[in-house]
Swiss-Prot record:
The keyword Mitochondrion does not apply. GO terms for biological process: muscle cell differentiation; positive regulation of convergent extension involved in gastrulation; positive regulation of non-canonical Wnt signaling pathway; regulation of transcription by RNA polymerase II. Residues 24-46, 63-89, 173-198 are annotated as: Disordered. InterPro entries: HD, Homeodomain-like_sf, LBX_TF. Transcription factor. One of its GO terms (cellular component) is chromatin. One of its GO terms (molecular function) is DNA-binding transcription factor activity, RNA polymerase II-specific. The lineage of its organism: Eukaryota, Metazoa, Chordata, Craniata, Vertebrata. Its main location: nucleus. The gene is LBX2. This is Transcription factor LBX2. It is found in: Nucleus. The keyword Heme does not apply. Residues 85-144 bind DNA. Gene3D superfamilies: Homeodomain-like.
Length: 198
């Protein structure tokens, strides 16, 4: 009954082997026929087929239905690796964000009692306030680092380039902002440029 090969798992019409293999009609439902020229049981194609079939078998039927605006691996629920499902992203109201930002300007870290009071006042969970402040501190850190990098790159520029960046386009004399050029570094204006109302 067994011709030296391991019994194969049933395949779907979407498996890679079915797509690549020539069309065949099985003779009996209990013993599917495979072409002799097909890949052997130890080929990479068979391994890939086995891996994908195990993966799709492990998925929940409800996980294949569209989730609430989320996509990606976390939307599939607990998988074979025991990952927990992520909580959905909190959409803060404009008033909540305004109050959180206002508090953050004065205080980057909250004491537990202050955090509880703020959460109660805004109608948020304590964990949401904690997470918001953590994310906001991380954003502040990124912004400060980006600003420092910008300042460092500006310091590396020549004064002429800095001047051209500082003046509006079409400015009359770019030489006005070059800094001290001699004993009298103030710009000189001609009589036509000075207007005096009588």
């Amino acid at each position: 009954m067994n011709s030296g090969r391991e019994p194969r798992t049933p395949r779907t019409l979407l498996s890679i082997a079915d797509i690549l293999a020539p069309r065949m009609v099985p003779r009996a439902p209990s013993a599917p026929q495979l072409p002799e020229s097909g890949p052997g049981p130890t080929s990479p194609l068979c391994a890939l087929e086995e891996l994908t079939s195990k993966t799709f078998r492990g998925l929940d039927a409800r996980a294949l239905q569209p989730s609430e605006g989320r996509a990606g691996p976390d939307a599939l629920g607990p998988g074979p690796f025991g990952r927990k499902r992520r909580k959905s992203r909190t959409a803060f109201t404009a008033q909540q964000v305004l109050e959180l930002e206002r508090r953050f300007v004065f205080q980057k870290y909250l004491a537990p009692s202050e955090r509880d009071g703020l959460a109660t006042r805004l109608g948020l969970a304590n964990a949401q306030v904690v997470t918001w402040f953590q994310n906001r501190r991380a954003k502040l850190k990124r912004d400060v680092e980006e600003m420092r990098a910008d300042v460092a790159s500006l310091r590396a520029l020549s004064p002429e380039v800095l001047c051209s960046l500082a003046l509006p386009e079409g400015a009359p004399d770019p030489g006005l902002c070059l800094g001290p050029a001699g004993p009298d570094s103030r710009p000189h204006l001609s009589d036509e440029e000075i207007q005096v109302d009588d």
